């Protein structure tokens, strides 16, 4: 059995030094999902996190990981620390705590606002697709931070569709067009409330949750300006 604290600390040191590796050393590599989740718990206990990323799996389940650090504002420059790629997402911020075992009504009521967001997409592994799933889960599912746009109240944000356009230096870099979820993202929140409590960080007011890639991951280029536009607002950053 690995030391979850040692693995979390090793990965964090790599992040701060801007280094990548082929794979975790054998004595730090989680053997299964439970050990990877223990690494997430150790990370949350030791390092700042503004919330969670969550995404649906191909078999109808969910995956989640803590977000790294504090959110960056719109218009941020990533020139000094550019990740390899970015995803365009819908984010939400909680206005109240949400405990495990919550109902759909409680999950909906806990949402304070919706936002356009960018997930900064990076990994401590040189080839993240070449390492095992538990190692990726321990590395917080490739999260390198988040940029969050202006808030929209639920009554303002919820529409029949989510339409997003993404541009690099004014050129089309991706589009997304899909129905707004029937449950208003409640099912994912209900699952995440249980998950977060088990990791030792129950969902609370102010937590930011990004809900899965709508566009991307899109590889980033240096010296470019990226902008997303949708009914949730406009959000941009530079590299």
Residue ranges and their predicted role:
Residues 2-184, 217-221, 225, 232-239:
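Catalytic-core "active-site belt" of small-molecule-metabolizing enzymes
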Residues 185-217:
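A conserved acidic, glycine/proline-rich C-terminal tail/linker
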């Amino acid at each position: 059995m690995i030391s979850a604290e040692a693995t979390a600390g090793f990965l964090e040191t790599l992040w701060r030094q801007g280094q990548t590796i082929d794979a975790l050393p054998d004595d730090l590599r989680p053997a299964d999902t439970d050990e990877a989740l223990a690494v997430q718990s150790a990370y949350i206990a030791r390092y700042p996190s503004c919330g969670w990323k969550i995404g649906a799996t191909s078999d109808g389940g969910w995956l989640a990981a803590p977000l790294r650090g504090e959110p960056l504002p719109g218009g941020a420059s990533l020139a000094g620390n550019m990740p390899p790629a970015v995803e365009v997402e819908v984010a939400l911020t909680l206005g109240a705590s949400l405990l495990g075992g919550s109902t759909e009504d409680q999950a909906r009521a806990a949402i304070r606002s919706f936002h356009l967001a960018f997930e900064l997409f990076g990994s401590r592994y040189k080839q993240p697709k070449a390492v095992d799933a538990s190692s990726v889960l321990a590395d917080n599912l490739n999260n390198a931070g988040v940029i969050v746009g202006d808030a929209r109240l639920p009554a303002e944000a919820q529409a029949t569709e989510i339409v997003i356009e993404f541009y690099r230096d004014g050129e089309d870099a991706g589009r997304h067009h899909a129905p707004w979820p029937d449950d208003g993202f409640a099912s994912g929140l209900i699952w995440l409330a249980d998950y977060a409590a088990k990791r030792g960080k129950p969902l609370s007011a102010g937590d930011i949750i990004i809900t899965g890639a709508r566009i991307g991951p899109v590889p980033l280029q240096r010296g470019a300006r990226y902008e997303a536009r949708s009914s949730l607002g406009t959000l941009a950053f530079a590299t």
